[in-house]
C-alpha cells in the first residue's frame, strides 16, 4: 500500500465534534501531519478499530505519530506504514530524538516484502539501535501494525493499573497494621479499651500527640472519664507509673 505524500490527498470528512467522555479504555491522539500522509482507507480503519476497542480518537499536532493515554500512563508510537530505505536516515534520527523525550516509546514498521524486511534489519544495526531502547515492532501491513499498537498500549495500561491497585492494597495493609499497633499500645494502658483508643485516635491523633495532651484537653475532646484521662496522662508522663509492673 503506497502512502499519499501530500495533504491534498486527504479526502475523508473532518471528524465529528468529540462526544462527552464515556467509560472506556482511554484516549488515542493521532498526529495531524502523520494523518495527512496516509491513505484515507487506513485512517477509516484506525477510527473504526479504536471505536470498537473503546478508545476516543483525537487529532492533534504532536511529535510522535500516536500517543495513547490509559489513565495514569501515556505511551507514544512512531508508525512507519511502508518502510522506505531511501528515508532510513530521517526515520532513525527521529527515533533517537523522541526516545530522549518520551519515557514509553515504541516504533512500529510495516515491511510487506522480504527485501524491505532485510533493508530494515540492516538499517537497525547500521544506526546502532539497542534492543528495547526503544522497542521496534516489524509487521507485514499497516492494519496489523495498528492492531499491534493498540494491544501494546492496552497491555501497558493494564499493567500500570494493576501496579496502582497493588500499591493501594499494600498501603491499606500498612494502614491496618499501623492501626493495630496503635490500638495495642493504647489498650496496654490499664483501664483503656478499644472504644477509648478509637476515641483518642479520632480526637487527638498520633501516639505522640496523645502523650502530650493534657487531662483537660482529653476530657474536652473525648467521652473518656476523668479517671481514664488521668490514667493516660500518668502513663505517658509519670516514670514511677509507666515503669512499674501492671496487673490487669
Swiss-Prot record:
Q: EC no.?
A: 3.1.-.-
Where does tissue-level expression of this protein occur? Answer: Highly expressed in anthers and pistil during meiosis. Expressed in pollen mother cells (PMCs) during meiosis. Expressed at low levels in roots, shoots, leaves, flowers, and glumes.
Q: Where in the cell is it found?
A: Chromosome; Nucleus; Cytoplasm; Cell membrane
Q: What class of enzyme is it?
A: hydrolase
The UniProt entry's GO biological process terms, in alphabetical order, are: chromosome segregation; male meiotic nuclear division; plant-type sporogenesis; pollen development; positive regulation of reciprocal meiotic recombination; reciprocal meiotic recombination; resolution of meiotic recombination intermediates
Which superkingdom?
Eukaryota
The terms under GO molecular function for this entry are: endonuclease activity
Cite a single Pfam family from the UniProt record: HHH_5
What segment(s) does the record annotate as region Disordered?
Answer: 1-25
When this gene is knocked out, what is seen?
Answer: Complete sterility of male and female gametophytes due to altered meiosis. Striking reduction in the number of meiotic crossovers.
User: Which key words tag this protein in UniProt?
Assistant: Cell membrane, Chromosome, Cytoplasm, DNA recombination, Endonuclease, Hydrolase, Meiosis, Membrane, Nuclease, Nucleus
Q: Please list the residue ranges that the record marks as compositionally biased, kind Polar residues.
A: 1-10
CC annotations in GO = chromosome; cytoplasm; nucleus; plasma membrane
Nucleus: is it a keyword of this entry? Answer: yes
Tell me its family. Belongs to the ERCC1/RAD10/SWI10 family.
Its quaternary organisation is: Interacts with SHOC1 (via C-terminus). Interacts with HEI10.
Per the entry, what this protein does is: Essential for normal crossover (CO) formation during meiosis. Essential component for the formation of class I meiotic COs. Interacts with SHOC1, another meiotic component, to regulate CO formation, possibly by stabilizing the recombination intermediates during meiosis. PTD and SHOC1 may form transient heterotrimeric or heterotetrameric complexes with HEI10 and/or ZIP4 to promote class I COs formation. Does not seem to be involved in early meiotic recombination steps involving double-strand break (DSB) formation, processing, and single-strand invasion.
- Name of the featured protein: Protein PARTING DANCERS homolog
Q: What is the lineage of its organism?
A: Eukaryota, Viridiplantae, Streptophyta, Embryophyta, Tracheophyta
Amino acid at each position: 500500500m503506497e502512502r499519499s505524500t501530500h495533504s491534498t490527498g486527504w479526502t475523508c470528512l473532518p471528524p465529528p465534534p468529540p462526544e462527552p467522555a464515556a467509560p472506556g479504555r482511554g484516549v488515542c491522539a493521532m498526529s495531524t501531519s502523520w494523518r495527512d500522509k496516509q491513505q484515507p482507507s487506513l485512517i477509516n480503519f484506525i477510527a473504526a478499530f479504536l471505536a470498537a476497542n473503546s478508545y476516543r480518537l483525537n487529532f492533534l499536532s504532536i511529535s510522535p505519530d500516536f500517543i495513547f493515554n490509559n489513565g495514569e500512563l501515556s505511551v507514544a508510537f512512531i508508525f512507519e506504514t511502508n518502510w522506505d530505505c531511501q528515508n532510513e536516515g530521517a526515520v532513525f534520527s527521529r527515533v533517537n530524538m523522541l526516545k530522549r523525550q518520551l519515557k514509553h516509546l515504541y516504533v512500529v514498521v510495516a515491511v510487506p516484502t522480504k527485501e524491505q524486511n532485510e533493508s530494515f534489519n540492516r538499517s537497525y544495526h547500521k544506526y546502532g539501535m539497542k534492543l528495547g531502547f526503544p522497542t521496534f515492532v516489524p509487521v507485514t501491513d499497516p492494519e496489523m501494525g495498528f492492531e499491534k499498537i493498540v494491544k501494546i498500549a492496552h497491555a501497558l495500561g493494564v499493567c500500570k493499573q494493576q501496579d496502582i491497585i497493588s500499591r493501594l492494597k499494600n498501603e491499606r495493609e500498612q494502614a491496618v497494621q499501623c492501626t493495630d499497633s496503635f490500638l495495642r499500645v493504647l489498650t496496654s494502658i490499664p483501664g483503656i479499651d478499644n472504644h477509648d483508643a478509637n476515641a483518642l485516635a479520632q480526637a487527638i491523633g498520633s501516639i505522640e500527640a496523645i502523650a502530650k495532651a493534657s487531662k483537660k484537653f482529653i476530657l474536652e475532646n473525648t467521652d473518656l472519664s476523668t479517671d481514664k484521662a488521668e490514667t493516660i496522662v500518668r502513663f505517658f508522663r509519670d516514670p514511677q507509673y509507666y515503669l512499674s509492673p501492671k496487673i490487669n
